[in-house]
Swiss-Prot record:
PANTHER family: SULFATE TRANSPORTER (PTHR11814). One of its GO terms (molecular function) is secondary active sulfate transmembrane transporter activity. Pfam families: Sulfate_transp (PF00916). InterPro entries: S04_transporter_CS, SLC26A/SulP_dom, SLC26A/SulP_fam. One of its GO terms (biological process) is nodulation. Belongs to the SLC26A/SulP transporter (TC 2.A.53) family. The chain crosses the membrane at residues 74-94, 97-117, 121-141, 152-172, 186-206, 232-252, 262-282, 321-341, 361-381, 400-420, 421-441, 455-475. This is Early nodulin-70. Its main location: membrane. The keyword Transmembrane helix applies. One of its GO terms (cellular component) is plasma membrane.
Length: 485
């Protein structure tokens, strides 16, 4: 009988069947497995709405929507946009892109994510770590980057591959790999990335035009020293403006932590800094006839006035670089997912609900694929913007939609006003976010709990700081693996 039972056992499902089942389970989740059987006997409109609710979870949250929730979401979305617009532009410059690409990335990915994701809090946009990782890894490619258009093609293609990997992770249930990525490695990586981001922003803070593209400590210090020796390479006005408004932003943040009633001031401080510094730069540069004679380095003309342009034709699959771009896309996909899921879980727990990791991963992947086709670069969950959204009283993902539409309006009507925005102020805004990436308490906890993990953390930190982002990650992951053997 036992042999007969084995012989009559059903064949395992095919790979295609497993993929189809995974897609259904990820995109059409439902707590009651009998629900869809029940809906078969219901009118078509009811079945269609149930399907749409599962495909687009935001519809379920809108069933009990009211005027009070709309008011909260409108205020949170506008507050979020005021905070996000300068940050999006600053992160774009960190990725060595024009500021408008940061604004593009603050429109399409958040709108798509708001419709598809199970999270009610995560705010999507360009992140500082992703921007640094993207620019530093593309700069290591041994292919000629003739001009900015070639670089942009590489950026969009990497974003496309990152989205493909993220969707695959979600559909094939590989989300657990991201969740179990060593926390020690991530802590060390983020701390070193924060130092790298800070060092790179010295370029904008001092108004230096010619600066080393590498992110390791030795290269950046050497570039700074060369610029300082050449007095004409920088102007003290840039440092004065950048440092003054950096202190202002940090001071408002301090006030917000001390007094919750003043939290709003820290949210609007970046935009106030952009407005104030732009007025100062306009006054200082007013009498100069040519941009090269400006004493304060400014952004100059920013392309705007329209929706995100299509970038499908800018994807490149050249056999010389496509393998390298796939590798970069995989690395960035994992790093951005790790941060996004951590942010989502943290804020979901504060509101007493959970998120579906695999659905989040698929949603992030879809938005990055679509983003790569609409002039966006890699987008992920932002801790600082999610915190602003939470503290501003957001009720649903409608606040994210309000933010994205506000960014769109600013791109369409206000880009001309950003001409005199100092580069130093964008550097100051990014620098103000750097301390949040360095978690000394977590590093201390890792040291107390597991010395081997702390060595992996240290290896990742030193590797990123003195070599490159990619080498640092490899050292952190491999050292932890070998130390555990």
């Amino acid at each position: 009988m036992a042999h007969q039972w084995v012989l009559n056992a059903p064949e395992p499902p095919s790979m295609l069947r497993q993929v189809v089942d995974n897609v259904k389970e990820t995109l059409l989740p439902h707590p009651n497995p009998n629900t869809f059987s029940y809906l078969r006997n219901q009118p078509f409109s009811k079945r269609a709405f149930a399907l749409l609710q599962n495909l687009f979870p935001i519809l379920a949250s809108l069933q009990n929507y009211n005027a009070q929730k709309l008011k909260c979401d409108l205020m949170a979305g506008l507050t979020l946009a005021i905070f996000a617009i300068p940050q999006c532009m600053g992160n774009a410059t960190l990725a060595r892109l024009s500021p408008e690409y940061g604004l593009y990335t603050g429109i399409v990915p958040p709108l798509i994510y708001a419709m598809l994701a199970s999270s009610r809090e995560i705010v999507i946009g360009p992140g500082s770590v992703d921007s640094l990782l993207l620019s530093s890894m593309i700069q290591t490619l041994k292919v000629p980057i003739h001009d900015s258009s070639t670089y942009i093609q590489l950026v969009f293609t990497v974003t496309f591959f990152a989205g493909i990997f993220q969707v695959a992770f979600g559909l094939f249930r590989f989300g657990f790999l991201v969740e179990h990525l060593s926390q020690a490695t991530i802590v060390g990586f983020l701390a070193a990335a924060a130092v790298g981001i800070g060092l790179q922003q010295l370029k904008g803070l001092f108004g230096i035009d010619n600066f080393n593209n590498k992110t390791d400590l030795f290269s950046v210090v050497k570039s700074l020293w060369t610029s300082f020796k050449n007095q004409s390479a920088w102007h003290p006005y840039n440092l004065i403006i950048g440092f003054s408004f950096l202190c202002f932003i940090l001071f408002t943040r301090f006030l917000g932590k001390r007094n919750k009633k003043l939290m709003w001031l820290s949210h609007v401080a970046p935009l106030l800094s952009v407005i104030g510094s732009s007025a100062i730069a306009y006054k200082i540069n007013f009498n100069e006839l040519q941009v090269k004679d400006y004493k304060v380095a400014v952004l100059g003309p920013i392309k705007g006035g329209s929706l995100n342009p299509s970038s499908l034709h800018q994807l490149t699959f050249d056999s010389q670089v496509v393998g390298h771009l796939i590798r970069i896309g995989l690395t960035i996909a994992i790093i951005s997912l790790t941060g996004s899921i951590a942010v989502g879980r943290s804020f979901a727990s504060l509101k007493g609900h959970s998120i579906d990791p695999n659905r989040e991963v698929v949603s992030l992947g879809i938005m990055n694929i679509v983003g790569s086709l609409t002039s966006c670069y890699i987008a992920s969950g932002s801790l600082s913007r999610t915190a602003v959204n939470y503290n501003a009283g957001s009720e649903t993902m409608v606040s994210i939609i309000v933010m994205a539409l506000t960014v769109l309006m600013s791109l369409k009507f206000l880009t001309g006003l950003l001409y005199f925005t100092p580069k130093a102020i964008l550097a100051a805004i990014i620098l103000s976010a750097v301390p949040g990436l360095i978690d000394l308490n977590k590093a201390r906890e890792i040291w107390k709990v597991d010395k081997m993990d702390f060595l992996a953390c240290t290896g990742a930190f030193l590797g990123v700081l003195f070599a490159s982002v990619e080498i640092g990650l490899a050292i952190g992951c491999r050292s932890r693996y070998h130390l555990r053997r």
